Amino acid sequence: VHLTGEEKSAVTTLWGKVNVEEVGGEALGRLLVVYPWTQRFFESFGDLSSPDAVMGNPKVKAHGKKVLGAFSDGLAHLDNLKGTFAQLSELHCNKLHVDPENFRLLGNVLVCVLAHHFGKEFTPQVQAAYQKVVAGVANALAHKYH
């Protein structure tokens, strides 16, 4: 991902304020509610029968935290996203058979959640930088599919 110094600063400054557990759970939960076909990858998570069940599900929250932990690792290695996400790409491609389009959807949901949590602080410039990052991460996660 090519980010200007200003964009990198905007991304890392905001990320330093992110509650990974809260934002991760909300982002994954929203993905499962807004795009219900993604729930098929999480059948072992128990009750996903309603939006309230999804958003309150402890396994969704825990996995969301794990997902954002990996995203944090990516932010520390923006110049080598493919390398950083190589193992996760292989896992999601070969073992889990996740449609790579879901990575793009989750990235966009994450941007929405960040905007919701940070309001005016999530300026159009910050959003533009995050859109580049989530697109880069989605591309890196889809790498083993090509």
Curated annotation (Swiss-Prot):
GO terms for biological process: hydrogen peroxide catabolic process. The modification Phosphothreonine is found at residue 12. It comes from the Eukaryota. The modification N6-acetyllysine is found at residues 59, 82, 144. Coiled coil: none annotated. The modification Phosphoserine is found at residue 44. Red blood cells. Keywords: Acetylation, Heme, Iron, Metal-binding, Oxygen transport, Phosphoprotein, S-nitrosylation, Transport. The modification S-nitrosocysteine is found at residue 93. Belongs to the globin family. Involved in oxygen transport from the lung to the various peripheral tissues. This is Hemoglobin subunit beta. The lineage of its organism: Eukaryota, Metazoa, Chordata, Craniata, Vertebrata. The gene is HBB.
